[in-house]
A protein has these predicted regions:
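Outer-membrane beta-barrel porins/channels
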Residues: 1-240
Length: 240
């Protein structure tokens, strides 16, 4: 890599290398407790997923292509005011700071000798302190409801809202992954057939959201990240 060669070798694993593969390991633990028939409490923790490096992109992501998955904390409650209705509320914490390739700010690159002769190679692309997406830790709040209208129909709806993980000072690198969504709305149903088979439908809509900020290498230009999402899933399950 550029860093491993002490800057004498041009970066060869930066872009245009097609697909790459990574594998990793992690763990999860959780508990669920129902003090009575109407209330269920739950909590879960998922460790950071330690992933193998993307060798074909070791000059792009920090730590020679390392791209770990962040740890998460989740707590939730489900309340059943009747036999037909269940209301659920979750709070989830995503620790993007666990993963340097995700959390490192793009300003780290300014300490690379290419930009700062007195700097260190570890701040260059692919270095141990190389630039990343600059994503911040975030909290996600989720509210959902499930209504069993009959023995054959169950309806569901949900809403989630979160902090914006991308600061307007981190625009250029995030062109690769413009994850600017803050809200998601979901709707769906399950229809149980006479033979016990089921038809499931779910619809997710994320309203358009925009983040705007200066281009990190030319502040006279603005970068606009905009995204809107729609997802439809239909499935059919049967019992033998």
């Amino acid at each position: 890599t550029f860093v491993e060669s002490a800057g004498s070798q041009a970066p060869r694993n930066l872009s245009g290398n097609g697909h790459d593969m990574s594998y990793g390991y992690g763990g999860s633990v959780g508990f669920q407790w129902s003090p009575d028939d109407e209330v269920t409490l739950a909590a879960a923790y998922t460790t950071k997923m330690s992933m193998s490096e993307f060798g074909d992109y070791e000059d792009l992501f920090a730590q020679a292509g390392d791209f770990d998955m962040p740890s998460t904390w989740t707590i939730g409650i489900a309340v059943r005011p009747s036999d037909k209705l269940t209301v659920m509320f979750d709070v989830q914490r995503i620790e993007y700071s666990d993963a340097d390739s995700v959390a490192n700010p793009i300003e780290n690159l300014y300490n690379c000798p290419v930009f700062n002769p007195a700097g260190s190679l570890e701040y260059c692309m692919g270095g141990n302190k190389g630039p990343g997406f600059g994503w911040e830790d975030m909290n996600v709040y989720k509210l959902g409801a499930s209504w069993k209208a009959s023995d054959t129909w169950t309806w569901r709806a949900g809403y989630s809202v979160t902090d914006q993980p991308i600061a307007d000072s981190q625009m250029t690198f995030n062109i690769l992954a413009p994850g600017v969504m803050e809200e998601h709305l979901t709707f769906g149903f399950t229809q149980k057939m006479k033979d016990g088979n089921e038809v499931n439908l779910s619809l997710m809509y994320a309203p358009e959201n925009t983040v705007r900020g200066p281009q990190n290498f030319d502040p006279t230009q603005d970068v606009i990240l905009k995204m809107q999402q729609v997802e439809l899933e239909i499935s059919y399950s049967w019992k033998r």
